[in-house]
Amino acid sequence: MSVKESYAGKINRKLNKKLHVIDVAAGRAPADLVLKNATYVNVFSNELCHGDIAVAEGLIVGMGEYHGKMEVDVSGKLVLPGFIDAHIHLESSLVSPTEFAKAVLPHGTTTVITDPHEIANVMGTDGIEYMLQATEDLPVDVRFMLPSCVPATPLDESGANLDYRSIDSFYDHPRVQGLAEMMNYVGVVNGDGQVVEKIVASQAHHKKIDGHAPGLSGKDLNAYIAAGVYSDHECSDMEDAMNKLRLGQYIMIREGTAARNLEALMPLLTSQYVDRCMFCTDDKHPNDLLEKGHIDYIVKKAISLGADPIVAVKAACHNAARYFLLNNRGAIAPGYLGDFVIIDDFQHFEIEMVYKRGVLMYDGQLRDFPAPEIDPYLVKRAHDTFHVAHLTAEDFSDGRPHAVIGMIPGEIVTQDAGYADHADPEQDILKIAVIERHKNTHHIGLGYIKGYGLKRGAVATSISHDSHNIIVVGATDEDMAAAANRIVENRGGITVMENGQVLGEVTLSIAGIMSDDSLVMVNSALEDAKDEAFGLGVSRGIDPFMTLSFMALPVIPSLRITTRGVFDVSSQRYI
């Protein structure tokens, strides 16, 4: 009986809200908020419209002439729907979700779709639950796609191994939209049952499946899409994008920190295919967030490159909302959320105000909001993810020659640069190692690297995609051990070391990949650490830490390093 009463009470509350919305829309009651004299982007008719915008119960209820308890005159300004990032790993910001929200709200972002595969590789399902709790009721609505590839490959030693059973219960969460980027497209195309069952499980819950298949074409692409993968964010040229568009995929145009594809894909925004395109960042690092912004930066850049402003705005909100079936946002129309971005004009694109569900969150000053409460067990778990014995110089010397990973300037791919049996900084030959840190296996993969430029000391980080073990490069074994030990002592982060002394560091104590500090503090420490790394000789043309973090991802040709040693991606063997 109590269940029926509870249900009846819920219906009654919703009925009262709905009746209030109808009364306000019909002009029989004042709105909670009215944006007076608005010029707004209509994403349905692709035009600028004029009139008041009335909001009640957090929803837009009408356009025309309205009166409200609060009225804001927006004459001479443009009102846009709140922006949506269609694909991002929040962990790439290096800060907590609360700090991320503080960073992007002033830039008009009101919804993001995140894939928490970074923290899931460290903490497994506890990592997913941590992020769900850490994003509850934030003024940026954080929606989730569940990680599809943990670990990224069987070659990785990650903190977890997630099959479809591990993540299945999360599909019932109201903020879970589907299955995140299916990176193992080879497994899909080859009909690997353990891979495809993740897609089948997501479809059984009537959820979306995102793609990740750079350059896939022909029958392989047919097979990938036939399996149920209907988007891709890895297109870097028009040929790849058109191949996928013609077969029904949506294209997420990526403009982030590590990869920037907007310019190459601009023809999509001036074509009949624009409704199949949306914007995403994928990865967004602290300096980018502070210096450039977020989705607003992509919109501004697209307009500067020749996109129709209304088309650019649609790609920043409406198209993503439609793809993810978020039918209550991405437009300014009755029944949609009162998520607004108010700018001066399309030319300057200065954001003056941001509203979330009809509440002013930014008007030159960001409004305060509380951080969500997280289960103490999960907080403790997230701050205790390093299980590594104390390291010594001897751990980095086995007396054998190892393959040399040859860096290529300006590229993320590498080449085979032969073998070496000792570090020779003058010849730009440095030792590189990956230390397993999740299960105290004492597995340490050794190799050498050419092109990094370090002349003295060592650089270490616990951001090493995708398993986030400790990766360290150095001129001496002693400094490599000291740098790696410092990472463990700090429970994660980035360290620049010389002669046993810390020159610069960033503490990332949340799972070893995010900080408890503010974005400004993290960025300041990061820039200082970069300067110290450059001072030790690291080549100025590279990012000392981002470059290092991708050296451990054994899916990018040609040579990579894991906890088992140097791996040849092309031949799929250790060398």
Q: Would you name each region that the model predicts?
A:
Residues 85-96, 151-162, 230:
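Active-site mouth loops of central-metabolism enzymes
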Residues 89-93, 117-119, 147-152, 182-185, ...:
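Active-site beta-loop-alpha junctions enriched in small/polar residues
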Residues 38, 58, 76, 87, ...:
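Divalent metal-coordination and catalytic microenvironments
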Residues 127, 161-180, 187-252, 259-279, ...:
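Histidine/acidic residue-rich metal-binding segments in metalloenzymes
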Residues 32-33, 70, 110-112, 140-143, ...:
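Structural motif
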Residues 1-51, 55-56, 64, 105-107, ...:
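Active-site microenvironment of metallo-dependent hydrolases
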Residues 2-24, 101-208, 272, 502-507:
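Divalent-metal coordination cores built from histidine and acidic residues
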